[in-house]
Amino acid sequence: MLLRKSIPYIKICRDISASVRNNKEIAQKLPLSVPLPMENNSKSIEKGCPPMGRNSRVTRLPNGLKVCTEDTYGDFVTVGVAIESGCRYENGFPFGISRIVEKLAYNSSESFSSRDEVFAKLEENSGIVDCQSTRDTMMYAASCHRDGVDSVIHVLSDTIWKPIFDEQSLEQAKLTVSYENQDLPNRIEAIEILLTDWIHQAAFQNNTIGYPKFGNNSMDKIRVSDVYGFLSRAHTPQRMVVGGVGVGHDEFVSIISRHFDLNKSTWTTQPTVLPAKIPEIDESRAQYTGGELRLDTDLTKLTIGKPYPLLSHVVLGLEGCSYKDEDFVAFCVLQSLLGGGGAFSAGGPGKGMYARMYTELMNRHHWIYSAIAHNHSYSDSGVFTVTASSPPENINDALILLVHQILQLQQGVEPTELARARTQLRSHLMMNLEVRPVLFEDMVRQVLGHGDRKQPEEYAEKIEKVTNSDIIRVTERLLASKPSLVGYGDIKKLKDLRSLDQAVAKRDLKYLFN
C-alpha cells in the first residue's frame, strides 16, 4: 500500500532528474553570454502558492495612528513601531534621554512585573525584540511566529505606552549608556560610528540633527519624571507608525486598535509621574551650518596587540538633501558611484571594486587604508560625506584626494561608469528588501516620512533615469555649500576649515597644500 502511494512521487522525481539532465546538456553547449532556455511549467504554479506581488496597505486610525502591512511567505513575521523621536528632538530635555529610553525598553510595565516576564512571554511565541534609536527615529521591532502576533503586540504596546520606571532601572540604564560612551573610543570597529556622529555635529552645529548621540550627555540631570515627560511628548499616535510584514492587514489593524490606546498610557492614568513643566518637542527645521570638529588624540592604544596600523581619520561633509527632495535619487546614485570600502574585505574581494574610491584612491595610493562615501538624508536636510583613513603623516594628502574626487565630478562621468553605479544601486535596493526585517524598516520609515509606501520598482525607475547632467548638477549643489570637517587621531598635519573652505569655494586644491 505504501509502495503504491509512493509511485507517483518517484515518477515526479524521475521527471525532474531527466529535466535537470537535459538542461545540463544544453547548458554545456551554450556560451555564458546566452540565457538558458527555461521551461515555464504553469501547472506547477497553479498547484502551488500563487505569486505574491507588492501589496502594501496603509490605514489611518481615528486617533491619528498609521498602520501599514505587507504580505510575505513564511510562518514568521516582523512587527513593530517607528516613532518620530531621537536625539534631534531632545532640545529642552536633558541630552541623552533618547538613549536612556532605548535602554529602558522591554522592562517592567503594567502587564509585566519584570524583564524576565517579558521575555518569557516572547519565548512562548518564538519571539525576539529590539529597540534602537537614531537621530530622528525610535524603532521598536519584534520577529515572531505568526500565531503569536497578538501577544507580541501586547508586549510592544506595554513597553511603549505603559512602562513602569523606578530609580533602580533608571540608574541601570545610565550605567549602560555611560559604559558604551567609554567603550566606543576603545573599539576599532566603532570609529565609523563616532565619525558619523561628529560630522553631524560639525555640519549642523547646535541644532536638530547636529545634537550629539554619543558622549557629552547630561545623564546626571535625567530623572524618572523627565523620562515620562519625554515619552508623553514623543509617544503620541500622530508621531507613530505601526507596521507588520507577513501579517493580514485587517486582522492586524484590529489587534492594533485593541492595544494602542493613548487613554491607557501610564502618563495619562497616572499624571503624577510627570514633571511640573514639560518642554514641547522641538519641530524646528534643520539648519546646515558647516563647521569643524578636531579631535587630536593618540590612537596607539587601538593598535596594541592587534594587526591594525596606526591611522588618522578625516571626514569631509557637504550639504546634501532631504529624502523628500527631487534630487534624492541622484544623490544616492552619486554615492553608489563613489562607493568605497577598506583595504581588508571580509568575505573576499570584489565588492565595489569598480567604485571610484577604489579605482581612484585605494588602488593608486597604498597608504589609503579605507575610503568611503555616505549620503545621510533626513526629512528636511542632509549631509553628504566622504571619509578616508591613512597614516598620520598622510592625513592631509587624504583630504586633498577627497576634495579632488568631488571636484572632478564637475566634468561628468563615463556612460559605462554611470550605468554600473545605477545597476549596483538597484541591486542593493532589491536584494536588501528580500530580508524581512529590512523590508519592515523600509516600509514604516516611508510611511512615517512620506505618509505612504513607495514600491521599490518606483525607485528603480527613478534610478535608471539618472543622467550625467544630474550627476553634474548635484555635484555643483554640493560644492555650493560650506564644507564641514572632522579630524580624528594624530591630525597635526591636517589643514583647517578655512583652507578647506577656500579650496571648495574657488575649486582649487592649492589652498590645501602646505
Swiss-Prot record:
List GO molecular-function terms, semicolon-separated: metal ion binding
Tell me the superkingdom of the source: Eukaryota
Question: Where mainly located?
Answer: mitochondrion
What are the recorded Gene Ontology BP terms? protein processing involved in protein targeting to mitochondrion; proteolysis
This chain's function reads: Substrate recognition and binding subunit of the essential mitochondrial processing protease (MPP), which cleaves the mitochondrial sequence off newly imported precursors proteins.
Q: Quote the subunit structure annotation.
A: Heterodimer of mppa-1 (alpha) and mppb-1 (beta) subunits, forming the mitochondrial processing protease (MPP) in which mppa-1 is involved in substrate recognition and binding and mppb-1 is the catalytic subunit.
Concerning PANTHER family, the annotation shows: METALLOPROTEASE (PTHR11851), MITOCHONDRIAL-PROCESSING PEPTIDASE SUBUNIT ALPHA (PTHR11851:SF49)
Q: What is this protein called?
A: Mitochondrial-processing peptidase subunit alpha
Please name the source species: Caenorhabditis elegans
